[in-house]
Each structure stands twice: as structure tokens, then as C-alpha cells.
């Protein structure tokens, strides 16, 4: 805002800035984490000096907000005012080098984009041509890829999911879990993609719920303590993202004991978790002991992966 006024010496009016918390990073599963997301966004807006803020209720993406969620959304702003006293300071981040550098860099990029749009005929022309939509949608695709590869974390969706949670019963607006947006009538211009970051993960979990059967995934942990814990945690997160039931273990003395425990637990998938050096010994033994009674997975990408594949395929052929 200040940069625009500096560039235009005739600027005589103060811009009115309104901020609204995002829906893009909201999630259906573990929905109360949405409170932390929206509170962080509201605080950022207050620090930036906006004139007004709208905090979205944490349950907005899957149902009509109730009295509780709307009251909490209002109170989130009151916390910033009455307990953090963000209304008492004109510019709370003034003097913070990293905040001001980041702010200036964002403002410079935004100004360049603004000028590019104006040079092409203005915002209306750019929207009708689909240029704005293409740029926004490309950004959405890039961020979704970051979520899919866990370079961007959404707690409860692609990291530390609660696999025991069932969401189908609480979803009132059926389109929300996989979309997050809507339309009325036939579009006459290219549309914006309003889908949220967690939408694909939620669709995967909903498919598991609708199937009526929750696969059990057994962590066969053995050998090197540090490596088996790291790989069992990664594998548990991986399968829990699909809503599969995770059966974790403290470790087994022998592969055979682990396999029998997995079969006794009724596991459909057995994940061997150990170190790269030990996989050459444990993987063939576990695969042989399992004898096709469940799907067999080796956690990680060990250097001996090609040798293991050849050995396991040879065993199948035999």
C-alpha cells in the first residue's frame, strides 16, 4: 500500500484492505487443526495492518458452520486484540529485517504482475482471455504437487493422519471433501480451480471408508533400532494417509516371529522395516515365511533393491 502511494505522488486516499483466511489449506480430517491455520493467517493479516479480517469457521468446508464454530471464529480475532494487543501497535513488524525484506520482495513481484496485466489491457481482458486463471491454476498444481510429495505439510492429511477417524458421517456438503468450490450455471470464461490442497488425500480416504473394509498394515520391525523406527514411522504415515489401520510393533527377535504375529493379527499388508545392510538377510526370509498370506513390502529404497527383486521374482517362479 505504501509502495503504491510512493509511486503515485497524487495518491490522496488511504486504501482499505480486507483479509480473509484461506480455505485452500483447510482439511476435512483432523478438522480442528484448521483453527491453528486460520489463527496464524489472521495474525499475519493483523501484523500487516489490514483494516478488517474475516476468519472462516473451521468446519466450513464440509458442513454449514454451526453456532460453536462461528463463535470460535469470532473469538479468534478477539484473542489477537484483547490478549495479543495487536491493535495497540501501528506496525508490529517494523524493524524486523527478515519480515520487511520478505514483504518488499512480495510487493515488488506483485507490482510487476500488476503492470503486466495493465499492459495487456487490464484485469477484465486478462480474465476473459484466461490468463489470470491459468496462472492461478498453475500455482495450485505446483502446491498440490508439494503436498503430494510432502514438501508442504498438512497435518492430519499427508502427515500424522489419524487413521481411526471417519469423516463420511460429518460431511453435509458432499462436494466439499474433493472440491472446495462450486459453480452456478455454465461457465463462459475459463474457470479457477478452487480445489484444496488435501482434496486428493481426502478422496483416497473416502474411498477406503466407502469400501466397507479397512486394510490392516503390519509393521514388521527388526534389526537396527534407529533405522527400523524411522522406516516404520514413514511407512505408517504413508499407509495411514489412505485410512488403512496401522499395527505397529516394538520389534521382533526373528523374522519368523514377526510374520506369525502379522498373520495372527489378520494383516493384509506386511511392511518389513530394518536397515539397508540387514535387508539382504531379512527380506528373503520374511518373504518365504509369509508364503503369500499377505502383500509384502520392504520399506525404503535399499541399495540391494534390484537383487531383492530378482530373488523374490525367482522365488515366485519356482
For the regions a language model picked out, list residue spans one by one.
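Conserved phosphate/anionic-ligand binding catalytic regions in large, soluble enzymes, centered on
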Residues: 35-55, 59, 122-123, 226-234
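Peripheral docking tails and interdomain loops at the edges
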Residues: 284-318
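Intrinsic disorder at enzyme termini
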Residues: 51, 116-215
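Generic long, charged, amphipathic alpha-helical segments
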Residues: 220-221, 227-234, 238-267
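Flexible, glycine/charged-enriched surface loops at secondary-structure junctions
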Residues: 7-16, 52, 83-93, 119-130, ...
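Conserved small/polar residues in nucleotide/adenosyl-binding loops
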Residues: 1-8, 313-318
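Mobile "lid/hinge" segments at catalytic clefts and subdomain interfaces of large enzymes
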Residues: 47-51, 55-94, 100-110
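Short glycine/threonine-rich loop-to-helix capping motif typified by GTGT followed
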Residues: 22-35, 63-73, 98-113, 132-147, ...
